[in-house]
Curated annotation (Swiss-Prot):
It comes from the Bacteria. PANTHER family: COBALT-PRECORRIN-5B C(1)-METHYLTRANSFERASE. This is Cobalt-precorrin-5B C(1)-methyltransferase. GO terms for biological process: anaerobic cobalamin biosynthetic process; methylation. Disulfide bonds: none annotated. Keywords: Cobalamin biosynthesis, Methyltransferase, S-adenosyl-L-methionine, Transferase. Pathway: Cofactor biosynthesis; adenosylcobalamin biosynthesis; cob(II)yrinate a,c-diamide from sirohydrochlorin (anaerobic route): step 6/10. It comes from Clostridium perfringens (strain 13 / Type A).
Amino acid sequence: MFDMYIESGGKKLRCGYTTGSCAAAAAKAATYMLFNKKDISVIEIDTPKNIKLNLEIQDIQVEKNSISCSIVKDGGDDIDATSGLEIFAKAEEVEEGFELCGGEGVGVVTKEGLFVEKGQPAINPVPREMIKKEVLSVLPKDKGVRITIFVPRGREIAKKTFNPRLGIVNGISILGTTGIVYPMSEEALKESIRIEIRQKAVNNKDLVFVFGNMGERFLRERGYKKDNIVVISNYVGFSIECALAQGIKDLTIVGHIGKLSKIAFGCFNTHSRVSDVRLEVIALELTLMGYDLELVQKVLDQKTSEGAVRLLGEDFPMLYERIGEKVLNRLDIYAYGEANFNILMYYGSKEMKLLYESKNSNLFD
């Protein structure tokens, strides 16, 4: 077991290693065994973080002109759909040089805008370099080798990853910029968002941001079909910056009042541990509109913005319009006026109802 830990939220969490590290280790081990005619049980590789990994080799299969083996992906304490997967590499002798191929269970890129060209196996640039470096370190100088990375359960597990959203089909991606998996990594999630924005920006002049699956469901239930929706989690500011960097000038943000209202107070990370001003936004607007303090206090006594909306009912359109306009103003300030923003604000979960839609919104035209 990989014995490296970090602290997050007061908890000690075990790190893991990426699919890229697994592929590099399996490829190195298969190459070594092919040309040295002997089995090994452990292989050492370097990672871009300069952390050495000693990984156990599994499922060695010897054929006439090739050898394959696997490394089991260990995601540590991270919530990782690929943890426990066997990542295989097959090494075959060729006349000269180094070749890298993707086999069964490794996804294929079908859209422009990713770090790998359309039509190529979804093995990202850093893992490609890791695989090549490790293989060449054990490949005899006068020999050539073809490496095929394959993942028997890759098609099945890919359905639980970002790949379907990115247009990567038939398998998982071989990923990792550091070689190490850091549990609950904010940076890893942000990088996934950045990649999706970059990919969606290739064929779209406008993007629609949603905070999660609920926002996407809200749109799909109303017949929205365009492939320009990006799930941004809580990272509003970061996602706007990524979109602007890709030349996107028209952005629509669709979200529950509990998320969107935070932006009215200038909160561009909407996670509750960073910003929890949902009820205060509603209460302030009611006060400014002249409602009595008894009603304002009832709103503040609610546990959620959902509770506040249900308390008030749907007879406060001016309230939601005022909140919506403040959200739009904050978005405009954040982007220095470089983008056109629209918002759709809803409440509810099983049955979602629209509270406010900005005047220039045309999502359903």
